[in-house]
Each structure stands twice: as structure tokens, then as C-alpha cells.
Amino acid sequence: MNKIQESFLYMLKVERFFSKHTLKSYHDDLVQFNAFLEHEHLKLKSFEYKDARNYLSFLYSKGLKRTTVSRKISTLRSFYEFWMTQDDTVVNPFVQLVHPKKEQYLPHFFYEEEMSALFETVEADGHKGLRDRVILELLYGTGIRVSELVNIKLEDLDLNSPGVKVLGKGNKERFIPFGNMCRESIERYLELFPPIQNVKHDYLLVNINGRPITERGVRYVLNDIVKRTAGVTDIHPHKLRHTFATHMLNEGADLRTVQSLLGHVNLSTTGRYTHVSNQQLRKVYLNAHPRAKKEK
């Protein structure tokens, strides 16, 4: 890793507020690129468009998914753009390289019956049971990311509205409302919160030692719930986020509103959930239209 690449990563951290996970991906992309340069006896500054095409072929030869290749090329394009701001003799060899098209996939989600089964499994009694229910209520009821969930502090809650303030990607703040069931679960949980708090902090969700729960801890909680729920498998925080978006659209929420609630920058990111919702539309159509009922 050379100085200009280190400066690039530093800029992403302090100016664009990239997460540790994203920064690691950018770092690994640059390390892989440097290894390619060394193997092919190429120089960073004299790297040309034809070399960029060869690198693209190299990535595909590794059997990588198109989404992964697209991200790696995007990293290098951004790096050279940054370098150009520092040195006007630098040319971006990736600027004309066409992005490989991303695979299209439908997000996995739970049906409403499955969500009901999950909630029925959680014992809303005692601190652990109440906490686990709050985790499930917030992830499904607001669609927030697990990273946003574990960073919720008491001051972020508004039990009057009710809703919660979270800090999303790019340090962007947003407020998400939630329903009465979620509010009641939080209120019951908070009644038992002060006695078990033996570490000074103001985070909402804690483990058995009173310390802030981690993302790994949340995943453990969800897996434990699924193990005790008949007919439900394969749970993870993002699947609950997918479920939130899908159910909102199925019940008539407009795409822009869901985009705002999820904290998506691009509407196209939210738009993938409409493909899932179209399944519900077709179900309604088949049940309602006289000429369509025969298609069943």
C-alpha cells in the first residue's frame, strides 16, 4: 500500500464517513490490485485502459460474482479520481470501462404468518424475553439495519410520537415511526432496564451483563428465536429489513416513503422490493378477476 492509496482510504474515513466494513473492502480491493500490478510488472501511474480491461478479465477468471467485480472496479475508478485531484498528470484508466451488470435477485422475506409465529415464540417476560421482543419489534417494525439497532440510545427514542432516531450510512440521520405494539414492548422493557444497568452508558439494548449488545449478539438472539419457532428457518437482521419493506409495499405504501424509511440514497435500491410485491398483486388479481381464476 503506497502513500496515495493510504491518503485515499483516510479521505473515505474522515470525509465520507465510510464504515469499517466498507473501508476494509476498499483496502482489500487495492491490495488485490497492487498484487496484479506486481505480477504483470505494471506501474500504478502508467496503468492504461487496455490494462484495465485485462484486469477486468483477470477478476472474472477468479470466478467472482458480477456484483463483486463491479464493486472492485468502482473502488479503482474512485481511487484514480481521487488521485487526479492530487496530481493533474494522472489519467483515470477505469473511466471508460463499462461496469459489469449486476445480478438481479429478489430479497428473501418472511410471510406475515411467519412473523406472527416468531413473535409468539418470544416470551415477553423477564429482562431477556422483553429485550428479545424489543429487538424483533424494532427490526421488523422500522426496517432499520442491525448496525443502527445496536447504536440506539435512550435519547434517540420518542415514545410520544412514537418513533426512533437513527444514524445511518454516511452519517445521515433519520427518524422512523413505529406502532403501539413496539412502543408497549419498549416501555415494559425499560421498566426493568435501570436495575440491571451496571455499566455507565445510555444504550437501549444490553446483554446479561448490562453492557451494550453487539451485532453478533443480535444475530445470536434471532437464531435462538428461530430454533424455537416451528416452520421458520434462516433468519438474519437484513431479512427482517426486507420483510419490513415488502409488507409496507404490499399494504399500499408508496416507494418514496419506503425509501425514506429505509434510508436508501437511490430509489432503484428500494425498487427491487416492488418485484416481490408484484407477487402479492398477482395473487389478488388471480383471486379477483373472472378471466384469471382459471390460471390457478
UniProtKB/Swiss-Prot annotation:
Pfam families hit by this protein: Phage_int_SAM_1, Phage_integrase
Record-linked Gene3D superfamilies: 1.10.150.130, Intergrase catalytic core
GO biological process entries: cell division; chromosome segregation; DNA transposition
Residues at the active site: 145, 169, 238, 241, 264, 273 (o-(3'-phospho-dna)-tyrosine intermediate)
PROSITE patterns xrefs: CB (PS51900), TYR_RECOMBINASE (PS51898)
Occurrences of domain Core-binding (CB) (ranges): 1-84
Domain Tyr recombinase stretches: 105-286
Known role: Site-specific tyrosine recombinase, which acts by catalyzing the cutting and rejoining of the recombining DNA molecules. The XerC-XerD complex is essential to convert dimers of the bacterial chromosome into monomers to permit their segregation at cell division. It also contributes to the segregational stability of plasmids.
Stated family: Belongs to the 'phage' integrase family. XerC subfamily.
Subunit-level organization: Forms a cyclic heterotetrameric complex composed of two molecules of XerC and two molecules of XerD.
Protein's recorded name: Tyrosine recombinase XerC
Gene name as annotated: xerC
